[in-house]
């Protein structure tokens, strides 16, 4: 991950209205019961149970993925049985992003990479170490966040840093880190028009 093509903007932009809007959009998307609060229970249900069950993960893959989701959102301060409102959620994201960027700068494993490894293992159906556009489309359909084929293809294009026509976990980690943590311009349109 030290290659120049995988370098990422390492400074946060927490006051950027677009960064805040991006996270507010996801907060609302992940608020399964629409009560204005979310909990780790909802995150695991949405990010793990629904998605992974729709992708045919093995029990081992499902457990690994669930553990990664728990650790990731736990890093943002979320807990089972505890509802988090928007102000606490965004503050948790700031802490998570700061911690993750420090790890990334030191070439240490990040929670987003650990989650990416777990998800990649499930999405990469032929286990060749790369995700094809068809595999990506199957995942985005199961996740429900990207609805249009155009947005799915745009996401794939943005993540395909080396322009190989396939995605590897390093590319995915780099682009998601830049999109969710720092507003890196190279990551714009990561979700097409599905996420601001």
From Swiss-Prot:
Changing residue 164 to N: In aequorin-3. One of its GO terms (molecular function) is calcium ion binding. The reduction of the disulfide bond is necessary to regenerate aequorin from apoaequorin. It comes from the Eukaryota. SUPFAM superfamilies: EF-hand. Ca(2+) 3 binds at residues 160, 162, 164, 166, 171. Ca(2+) 1 binds at residues 31, 33, 35, 37, 42. It holds the Pfam family EF-hand_5. Keywords: Calcium, Disulfide bond, Luminescence, Metal-binding, Photoprotein, Repeat. CDD domains: EFh. GO terms for biological process: bioluminescence. Belongs to the aequorin family. This is Aequorin-2.
């Amino acid at each position: 991950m030290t290659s120049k093509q995988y370098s990422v903007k390492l400074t946060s932009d927490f006051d950027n209205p677009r960064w805040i809007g991006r996270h507010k959009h996801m907060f609302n998307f992940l608020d399964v019961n629409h009560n204005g609060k979310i909990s780790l229970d909802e995150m695991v249900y949405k990010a793990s149970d629904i998605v992974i069950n729709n992708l045919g993960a093995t029990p081992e893959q499902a457990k690994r993925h669930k553990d990664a989701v728990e650790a990731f959102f736990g890093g943002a301060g979320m807990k089972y049985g505890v509802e988090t409102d928007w102000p606490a959620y965004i503050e948790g994201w700031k802490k998570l992003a700061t911690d993750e960027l420090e790890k990334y700068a030191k070439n240490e494993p990040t929670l987003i990479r650990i989650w990416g490894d777990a998800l990649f293992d499930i999405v990469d159906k032929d286990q060749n170490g790369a995700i094809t556009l068809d595999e990506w489309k199957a995942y985005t359909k199961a996740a429900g966040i990207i609805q249009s084929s155009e947005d799915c293809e745009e996401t794939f294009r943005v993540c395909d840093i080396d322009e190989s026509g396939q995605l590897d976990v390093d590319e995915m980690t780099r682009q998601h880190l830049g999109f969710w943590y720092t507003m890196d311009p190279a990551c714009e349109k990561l979700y097409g028009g599905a996420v601001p």
